[in-house]
């Protein structure tokens, strides 16, 4: 049984500003390139054999109104000078017949690097715990990714951060993993 398994995945991010929370969210989705689609929230599994593609390649495979399965991180504020962050982390096993993990992280006061690193670590820890070796998970500073013996192929993240610039203005950030079923 093959089921309904996504074959491609891409990552995107956006920032939006507006007079209302909804308007700023729509602007963030537009900035991320995913506003013309119906977003359906899913949990944190990076499908076996799914190919990671660029945002540009992914958007070419889509049609307006299409239902998109996403792991979406979102944060918003209208507090002047407040920094909002959203990040998606991923961890992919070396054995691509196995599933990996996606994680979402939403925070205040964190830079893109800090938020992204946290989301990446979450995904790596979830993957390591399914392999049964979470105590041996280590960060390789040279490769800038988490490693677990020879079991993790790659880890990474995408993040978006913005500061509320005007009083009364809503600012929203999004980061998303978009999964495509063909």
UniProtKB/Swiss-Prot annotation:
Residues annotated as site: Cleavage (non-hydrolytic): 43-44
Record's keyword terms, sorted: Decarboxylase, Lyase, Pyruvate
Catalysed reaction, written as an equation: L-arginine + H(+) = agmatine + CO2
PTM annotation (Pyruvic acid (Ser)): residues: 44
Pfam families: PvlArgDC
A biological process from GO: arginine catabolic process
InterPro entries given in the database record: Pyr-dep_his/arg-deCO2ase, Pyr-dep_his/arg-deCO2ase_sand, Pyruvoyl-dep_arg_deCO2ase
Presence of keyword Metal-binding: no
Requisite cofactors: pyruvate
EC supergroup of this enzyme: lyase
Any GO MF annotation of the entry: arginine decarboxylase activity
Record EC number: 4.1.1.19
Cofactor note: Binds 1 pyruvoyl group covalently per subunit.
HAMAP family, alphabetized: PvlArgDC
Matching PANTHER family: PYRUVOYL-DEPENDENT ARGININE DECARBOXYLASE
Family: Belongs to the PdaD family.
Full protein name: Pyruvoyl-dependent arginine decarboxylase
Organism encoding this protein: Thermoplasma acidophilum (strain ATCC 25905 / DSM 1728 / JCM 9062 / NBRC 15155 / AMRC-C165)
Lineage: Archaea, Methanobacteriati, Thermoplasmatota, Thermoplasmata, Thermoplasmatales
């Amino acid at each position: 049984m093959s089921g309904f398994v996504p074959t491609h995945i891409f990552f995107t991010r956006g920032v939006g500003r507006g007079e209302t929370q909804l308007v700023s969210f729509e602007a963030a989705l537009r900035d991320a390139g995913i506003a013309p689609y119906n977003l359906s929230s899913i949990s944190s599994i990076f499908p076996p054999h799914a190919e990671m593609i660029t945002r540009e390649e992914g958007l070419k495979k889509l049609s307006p109104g299409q239902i998109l399965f996403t792991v979406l991180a979102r944060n918003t504020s209208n507090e002047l000078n407040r920094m909002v962050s959203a990040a998606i982390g991923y961890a992919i096993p070396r054995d691509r017949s196995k599933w990996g993990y996606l994680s979402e992280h939403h925070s205040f006061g964190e830079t893109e690097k800090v938020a992204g690193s946290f989301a990446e670590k979450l995904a790596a820890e979830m993957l390591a715990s399914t392999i049964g070796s979470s105590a041996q998970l280590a960060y390789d500073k040279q490769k800038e990714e988490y490693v677990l013996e020879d079991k993790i192929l790659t880890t990474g993240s995408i993040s978006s951060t913005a500061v509320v610039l005007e009083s009364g203005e809503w600012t929203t950030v999004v980061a998303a993993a978009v999964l495509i079923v063909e």
